[in-house]
Structure formats: C-alpha cells, structure tokens
Amino acid sequence: MFNQFGDLERCALRPGNMHSADGWDSILKPVVARYRGKVSRIHFRADAGFANPEVYEYLEGEGIKCAIRLPANRVLQERIGDLLTRSVGRPPNEARRSFANFTYQAGRWTKPRRVIAKVEWLAGELYPRVGFIVTNMARPAENVVAFHNKRGTCEQWIKEGKGAVKWTRLPCRSFAADAVRLQLHALATMSGISCARWRRPSRSRTGR
C-alpha cells in the first residue's frame, strides 16, 4: 500500500492461493490508525482485489472517502446496456468516453451504494472497454474516475520496486523467512526514496 507521495505504507507476503482481499484489515487498519488525527481527510483508492463489503463498511464507518474497482457482472452491464451498443456507421477515429451513475446492491451488501461506469470506445477496436467503480464520493463521475485512475501510478511504483530492489526475489526455503525478506526489501525501498528526497534541491536554493 502506497500513499499519494510514493511512500510504501505497508506490505505483506501471502500464499498464492489466498484471495487478494483476505487479511485486508491487517494492512489497512494500521495505516488508517497512523494517520487518524494527523490529517483532515483520508481518501482510499484500490483495484478489484479490495472489492469486499467488509472493506466498504469499514471505510464508511471511519468516514473515509473511497473509490474501488468493481468486477463486472451481468447485472452491472445490463444497467448500462445503452452505452454498450456501438453507433451505426464507421468506428470513430478518436476515443469516445461515456459515464453512468446508478445505485447498486450486490447480494452480500447490506445497503445500495453508488456505482460509476466508464465506457470507452477506442479507435480501431470493435468492442468498448468498460470499468465499474463503487464509491461513496459525491464528486462528478468524471472526477471520481480521474481520482481512481491515479492508482496506475502505484502500479508503476510496484514495477520500480520489482526492478530496482527485486521485491519478488524470495528464494528462502520457508514462508516466514521470505516474509521477513520482503520487509527488508520494503525498508530498502523507503531508504532509497528518502535519500532521493534529501538530495533533491529545494525551490529556495534553486530560485524557482
């Protein structure tokens, strides 16, 4: 888990057969507790691995605004059926994006929630790209999607960690040893980030 500045807040090694949302509380709750009372607002964005009603209820209970990717299903696609039909004529030469807002309640949810759909027709493609986000934000749909899309920067930080510090190089014979090794990799990552910031000239010194 990263914050908006690229700081690695928390990481954990888990078995390959474990769902990505399992154990979410051991990752998310300590980070929220660390920031509670120190910042005025906390926002959370995540991929579909955190699409879990327990996560939603925890964030809502803590007053945290969130935008979480929601896996597509037949019911969601039926709600935006009119946006999934391609216009008659030649495919567009430029991307066309449409947004939809609606309330939705999955079987395990205790209440309906706001869902935003983004439908994108790209030049040269026969079928649209569709994404769903569940959110408790009151922002316009385009703004919520833009906020969630910044999660892609986090993916880049993960790639950098894999390339520079070899996060995924865990050759130990035991799971526990590899878990410790991952934490050492995380510490090395944050040490590198801190050194880079200390070396970066301030605006006052550069005159900018």
Ranges and model annotations:
Residues 1-38:
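Electropositive, glycine- and tryptophan-enriched low-complexity nucleic-acid-binding patches
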Residues 6, 42-51, 66, 133, ...:
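Short, conserved catalytic/metal-binding motifs centered on acidic residues
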Residues 16, 47-51, 71-73:
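Active-site beta-loop-alpha junctions enriched in small/polar residues
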Residues 52-57, 77-81:
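A short acidic (Asp/Glu
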Residues 56-65:
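Short, surface-exposed basic-aromatic patches at helix termini and helix-loop junctions that form
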Residues 65-166:
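An anionic, glycine-rich sequence signature occurring as long contiguous blocks
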Residues 123, 172-182, 206:
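Structural motif
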Residues 191-208:
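A short, flexible helix-boundary coil/loop motif
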